[in-house]
Amino acid sequence: MRALLQRVSAASVTVDNAVIGEIGPGLLVFVCAMRGDSEAEATQLVQKIARLRIFRDDAGKMNRSVSDTSGAVLVVSQFTLGADTRSGTRPGFSKAAAPDEGMRLYHCFCAKMRETGLTVQTGEFGADMKVSLVNDGPVTLWLDTDDRRNTSAGSG
């Protein structure tokens, strides 16, 4: 499972000219389920995101998590994070999960994020969405559960 996180002062997502999700300070999380992913990857990614220390403490160091700051999370599905751009000029998306499985894992991810106690807003899976944000920092991070799986396998 892949996620692109942005620390934001504010973010919103609009579908058909209506705002369906909106947060103040916190994280905007674009998420994509990959072929072969399961609920285990969703759980792993949620746990990492909820505890990732990318918010400033009183000394100005990135030492606090979104949970520590009582921040909110806006989760937006984005299958294009699964793009393969290694050859040619047109991205391929065969590594992203099939739409039905992608939707199931997206909803699983959102439910698990809510279980952390954080305030969670969401986009609409598969919809044409307009996302607005004020990036704070800027701080933008890429997470991929496959990276952790490969690292763990090699550290044995």
UniProtKB/Swiss-Prot annotation:
One of its GO terms (biological process) is D-amino acid catabolic process. Keywords: Cytoplasm, Hydrolase, RNA-binding, tRNA-binding. It catalyses: glycyl-tRNA(Ala) + H2O = tRNA(Ala) + glycine + H(+); a D-aminoacyl-tRNA + H2O = a tRNA + a D-alpha-amino acid + H(+). The keyword RNA-binding applies. A motif (Gly-cisPro motif, important for rejection of L-amino acids) lies at residues 137-138. InterPro entries: Daa-tRNA_deacyls_DTD (IPR003732), DTD-like_sf (IPR023509). GO terms for cellular component: cytoplasm. CDD domains: Dtyr_deacylase. Its EC number is 3.1.1.96. It comes from the Bacteria. An aminoacyl-tRNA editing enzyme that deacylates mischarged D-aminoacyl-tRNAs. Also deacylates mischarged glycyl-tRNA(Ala), protecting cells against glycine mischarging by AlaRS. Acts via tRNA-based rather than protein-based catalysis; rejects L-amino acids rather than detecting D-amino acids in the active site. By recycling D-aminoacyl-tRNA to D-amino acids and free tRNA molecules, this enzyme counteracts the toxicity associated with the formation of D-aminoacyl-tRNA entities in vivo and helps enforce protein L-homochirality. This is D-aminoacyl-tRNA deacylase. It comes from Ruegeria sp. (strain TM1040) (Silicibacter sp.).
